[in-house]
């Protein structure tokens, strides 16, 4: 915990550094979405084939989040962060040097290992390091780091890839991670493991039907989103017939709209989280259904992307808030499960998009994605009626 001897300025610097780390980790997860065509060209592959790296990355995170969290549950958190950053940086150097697609995938697995540990401990660390009475704002800052990864990280990474090659994008992320590591070493105090939970926590969490229902909702709605989002760059260029530069602009718009979603949730989420999540899922479903019809013009796609970005950010924030509220006694285990389940959804969505693109038509990714979105909408209405009080509680720390 931050003590009385720690100034509010230092406490906020620590949280901001974690938010920057969140920005970097999310940038590297999202950025291949904007680089698929370039990566495919360099290895003489089809774009849809290279998309499998998104699924592999996400499913490695999903499989390893809980085992790694349990293996490191007693490790002092500052040391753990330093070690995972070293792995993260080394893996990006390998991505830069990758001489084959297989080597690139191996390097991404290394990044995924670091990612799996990072996201299982970061939310609870931000809460511990925040100034007194500012824990909700600390979580919001982490969410902002995530949003900025979509707003700036993904499109800037794509621009760097367009002009200097996709390898340079990965190298730049590694350099950014190195600078962030130096800040973490300087700013963070010793952070003994706290409320990390253990294997004993799992049966307790699994006996919470409201929490399990939120996990199921998460995987279904994330699958819906990533079915289309994973292939938005080749969709814009190959299906809509628009320029590579517009694909970059569209990613910028979609990410920027996420900040609007974050602001809306920050204003209304305390008292109306369940309603906001259901409305956002309905909005996501509408955007997916309208993706192909909107592809007739840049203006239509840009407007659709605004609503899409708002929807997915409100969904992500809503899920995280509810998980923290439902598992205050084992935050690291609960968030590790959440990270894993979220990434199962990413991997499933990317795989569905991959199969639709290869065996059907990339033009249909929005329509196919709308199916799990509809199922998620129905499920959200059911569970928010079944556990209305429990699911409106906010995390207490």
Curated annotation (Swiss-Prot):
Disulfide bonds: none annotated. NCBIfam families: PRK03545.1. The keyword Transport applies. This is Probable sugar efflux transporter. It comes from the Bacteria. PROSITE patterns: MFS. Belongs to the major facilitator superfamily. SotB (TC 2.A.1.2) family. Keywords: Cell inner membrane, Cell membrane, Membrane, Sugar transport, Transmembrane, Transmembrane helix, Transport. The gene is sotB. Its main location: membrane. GO terms for molecular function: carbohydrate transmembrane transporter activity. Involved in the efflux of sugars. The physiological role may be the reduction of the intracellular concentration of toxic sugars or sugar metabolites. It is found in: Cell inner membrane. GO terms for cellular component: plasma membrane. It is a multi-pass membrane protein. The chain crosses the membrane at residues 15-35, 51-71, 81-101, 103-123, 136-156, 170-190, 209-229, 246-266, 273-293, 301-321, 333-353, 364-384. The keyword Cell inner membrane applies. CDD domains: MFS_NepI_like. It comes from Escherichia fergusonii (strain ATCC 35469 / DSM 13698 / CCUG 18766 / IAM 14443 / JCM 21226 / LMG 7866 / NBRC 102419 / NCTC 12128 / CDC 0568-73).
